[in-house]
């Protein structure tokens, strides 16, 4: 046997196997997605997302307190308005009495050490279920005013106390619009801008759309989310968002797009890189484990470690509560 053929001596021991990883999973890498509804007492199971719930603001202390004591560092909030009147411009998105702003304010008071990100989009709040304004009398997105409206919502969340605003709408120009408003308001140095830069038009969003009530009333979102086979377009979107002032770059979904995540690491070596293990990915892992195909913990680790290997420094994951326990084991 050639000397260069011998590899196993370098990973025969569990500790030596850990050393083979450039980076290992830590609790601080995980950001937990939380669905916030406008019923302050809500605690409602989400059938399509096993183990996840819609929460009212008055339930957050009892829910998140134990997780924070286990080491939870960050959450990202998604509004689920059930009682508001939706309109063409998504007016409830930045309602001071809406679920996201109330949750930001409450969490800042309850848990000063918790990092709070807020997803910024209009689809949960518009009467048509799309992520921006429509040209009058048409079903075509009006990009420029959509980007400005998204920026207004982001600014409202920043003013409420969000540490991070994360626009997921995929409107052209929204990163620059948000950054400009944060600068003009004197908040650009106090609020992180995390861009869903490479967000693909994926079939893996179904459980989330049920959870958030964000299914479009007509058509789909393929005109503004990226085509799944468009690697070059994703690279251009990442470059654009860096130039427009994004502080963190995100790839979504995660597992089918690890090549894009690796591209992002090459394009933006100085930026933190996030990926979102989306609802469909989570549901598949849970379903496979329930069917006896594999053990849940094993597959949760394998998928998450593949994301870190590809370059992720931050993982948005519904498995976050489990990892708080698993990483202590």
Task: Indicate residue ranges for each PLM-predicted region.
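Alpha/beta enzyme core
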Residues: 13, 21-22, 26-31, 37-329
